[in-house]
């Protein structure tokens, strides 16, 4: 009696942590190339920080009574040395930590950018994931409203470069610490009048972080939040001048905006300017980029008092918008797919593929899936499916004659017709392909 083979359980990914598959990676690469070009144009330098940081960095930097710290962080104790560690839920605190640790500001301000995965333990839904990706900028050592305006302008320029429309800018000022303290007293007094109707979340925040009550999504509390004392009415001359300076620069650059007095952001390190870029095309998760000024943070994390501002944007949400507006670029295929029939032809084809790559062409060499030689027909099907512009064909007869077959798979070859096979001397193959591709590109431009 034969023993029945035990079925091996199929493993799946963690919910809310998504694979980026080859058919989607092209869109990611398009976005990354676009944003990196923009960041270079503004003189920003790339910084890369670890995914795991000491938990204290976030409790001290973000704030202990924020949603992120209270219930969204992936934290654990390192079994090796007992350290409390956290997978980064955002990256501003880490960039600031790195700038202090490596004394990066000793010779003046820095413009930095980052890109990578962040992690938050929350219920996955459209536009909100447990592992998500952000690109962000941090302008360290710049105190004026011109720095705020510049980082906002960068976002507008990115939307234009990507072709995105309908993303609207909302701004507010959180003022200085003493202004927020005065407003906090009046806000708590106001909210206490409605203690019996506040939801559990608002009651929890009432005495710890009452500003966040203004940001409630509960429809039953909207009128209460709308009529609450406004922080902007508590701003002193310095804060007002900064906010008005920002507005003048935005207007001078034709950047429309709305002042939203309920815009407070969910991180404790902000002061003065805060802003969000929002859209109504993504349902509840309408914020695609957000940021502001965080002048106290560098000193709070052990550095010298230094002004700073920045933003972060959710890449998944922006890619969703690109798909929604049908702006995703077509996937580009390789330049050449090399097929072959016969052992001698296979060896010559392998050598030729490497020589073509030496010239900068993108080349796929047909490798056997099961170790057995594939038929010419099946190889040509693979060539067509690969998206290659040309198939280069090595057969025993061609090799004996010192020639190779070339077939245009996408556009016109030198003869002007797709799928017309031409015979080319091996030594002229590279020149022929380059000329044919130039001609095809020019035809596409017409």
UniProtKB/Swiss-Prot annotation:
So what does this thing catalyse?
tRNA(His) + L-histidine + ATP = L-histidyl-tRNA(His) + AMP + diphosphate + H(+)
What Enzyme Commission number does this protein have? 6.1.1.21
Q: Which PROSITE patterns match?
A: AA_TRNA_LIGASE_II (PS50862)
GO terms (BP aspect): histidyl-tRNA aminoacylation
- Tell me the keywords, alphabetical order: Aminoacyl-tRNA synthetase, ATP-binding, Cytoplasm, Ligase, Nucleotide-binding, Protein biosynthesis
Q: Which cell locations does it reside in?
A: Cytoplasm
User: Which InterPro entries does its entry note?
Assistant: aa-tRNA-synth_II, aa-tRNA-synth_II/BPL/LPL, Anticodon-bd, Anticodon-bd_dom_sf, His-tRNA-ligase, HisRS-like_core, HisRS/HisZ, HisRS_anticodon
Query: Which GO molecular function terms does the record list?
Result: ATP binding; histidine-tRNA ligase activity
Name the principal localization, coarsely classed: cytoplasm
GO CC terms on record?
A: cytoplasm
Q: Which domain of life is it from?
A: Bacteria
Q: Which PANTHER family match?
A: HISTIDINE--TRNA LIGASE, MITOCHONDRIAL-RELATED, HISTIDYL-TRNA SYNTHETASE
Query: Which family is it part of?
Result: Belongs to the class-II aminoacyl-tRNA synthetase family.
Assembly and binders: Homodimer.
Q: What's the name of the protein? A: Histidine--tRNA ligase
Organism equals Burkholderia ambifaria (strain MC40-6)
């Amino acid at each position: 009696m034969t023993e029945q083979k035990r079925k091996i359980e199929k493993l799946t990914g963690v919910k809310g942590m998504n694979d980026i598959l080859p058919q989607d990676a092209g869109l990611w690469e398009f976005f990354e190339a676009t944003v990196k070009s923009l960041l270079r144009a503004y003189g920003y330098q790339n910084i890369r920080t670890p995914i795991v940081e000491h938990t204290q960095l976030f409790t001290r930097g973000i704030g202990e009574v924020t949603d992120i710290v209270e219930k969204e962080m992936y934290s654990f104790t390192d079994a090796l040395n007992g350290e409390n560690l956290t997978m980064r839920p955002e990256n501003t605190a880490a960039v600031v930590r790195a700038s202090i640790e490596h004394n990066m500001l000793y010779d003046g301000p820095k413009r930095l950018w980052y890109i990578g995965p962040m992690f938050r333990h929350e219920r996955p839904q459209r536009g909100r994931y447990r592992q998500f990706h952000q690109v962000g900028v941090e302008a360290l050592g710049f105190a004026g409203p011109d720095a705020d305006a510049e980082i906002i302008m960068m976002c507008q320029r990115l939307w234009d470069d990507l072709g995105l429309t309908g993303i609207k800018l909302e701004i507010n000022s959180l003022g200085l610490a003493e202004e927020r303290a005065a407003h906090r007293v009046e806000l708590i007094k106001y909210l206490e009048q409605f203690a019996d109707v506040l939801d559990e979340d608002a009651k929890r925040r009432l005495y710890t972080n009452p500003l966040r009550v203004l940001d409630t999504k509960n429809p039953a509390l909207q009128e209460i939040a709308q009529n609450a004392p406004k922080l902007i009415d508590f701003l002193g001359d310095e804060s007002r001048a900064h906010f008005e300076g920002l507005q003048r620069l935005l207007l001078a650059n034709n950047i429309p905006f709305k002042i939203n007095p309920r815009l407070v952001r969910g991180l404790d390190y902000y002061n003065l300017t805060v802003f969000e870029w929002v859209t109504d095309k993504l349902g509840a998760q309408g914020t695609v980029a957000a940021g502001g000024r965080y002048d106290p943070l560098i000193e709070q994390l052990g550095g010298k008092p230094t002004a700073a501002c920045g933003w972060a944007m959710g890449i998944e949400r922006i890619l969703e918008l690109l798909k929604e507006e049908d702006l995703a670029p077509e996937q580009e295929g390789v330049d050449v797919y090399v097929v072959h029939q016969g052992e001698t032809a296979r060896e010559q084809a392998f050598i030729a593929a490497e020589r073509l790559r030496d010239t900068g062409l993108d080349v796929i060499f047909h490798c056997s899936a099961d170790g057995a030689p594939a038929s010419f027909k099946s190889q040509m099907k693979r060539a067509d499916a690969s998206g290659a512009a040309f198939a280069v064909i090595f057969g025993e007869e061609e090799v004996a004659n010192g020639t190779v077959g070339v077939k245009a798979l996408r556009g016109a070859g030198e003869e002007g017709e797709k799928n017309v096979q031409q015979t080319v001397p091996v030594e002229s193959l590279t020149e022929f392909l380059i000329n044919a591709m130039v001609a095809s590109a020019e035809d596409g431009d017409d």
